[in-house]
Amino acid sequence: MTDRPDADLPADLPADLPTRDIARALVFDPANRLLLIEYEAVRPIDPARPEARGFWFMPGGGLEPGESHEAACRRELSEEIGVTEVELGPCVAVCDGPFHLFRKPRWARERYFVVRLASDAVDTSRLAETEDNPVRGTRWWPLAELAASAERIEPAGLAELAQRIASGDVPDQPVRLDWQNA
């Protein structure tokens, strides 16, 4: 464990969260839409709207022992969206901090890679069996809709980063993103 500012967490969470290294992908189709997965949060997202529990996230997941971020990203894409032959682009962003919308709150250390698919055909039939939280569905988001959406998209700044990448401006160093709840 590292020295972290866990004091800002909701009162019902443990003060010392376990750390989880995670790899995720910004998955683009040929039309430059971004694939996201909708999950159901285990606790209210917005105290003013306790019924609002849906949030959108990129495909990806935790590293297995000895696994690199790149290898984990490829494995997760196979498990979650059925994509096995994929060219992984560069790591374009990082997001480190406490995340408490999943069943198992954690200090997440996430790395995000770019993936461009030749079509929008994905197989999500195994997605629900690999996830801690209920999966509500998947969606290919047009980037303008993603940027204008009032829905909870994690992490903050994802829509802007996706638009930047789609326009051809791929960061040469990973940018830092933050959780909506940070």
Kindly give the residue locations of the regions a language model identified.
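N-terminal strand-loop-strand
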Residues: 2-58, 70
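The catalytic Nudix box helix
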Residues: 58-92
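Residues that scaffold the ATP/ADP-binding catalytic core of kinase and kinase-like folds
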Residues: 37, 66, 146-149
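Active-site-adjacent beta-strand/loop module that shapes the phosphate/pyrophosphate-binding cleft
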Residues: 96-126, 139, 164
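Nudix hydrolase/Nudix homology domain
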Residues: 53-56, 119-123, 127-182
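Short, charged/polar surface micro-motifs in flexible loops or helix N-caps
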Residues: 28-34, 42-43, 64, 94-98, ...
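A generic structural micro-feature
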Residues: 17-19, 50-55, 103-109, 130-135
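A structural signal for short, well-ordered beta-strand segments
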Residues: 25, 91, 111-113
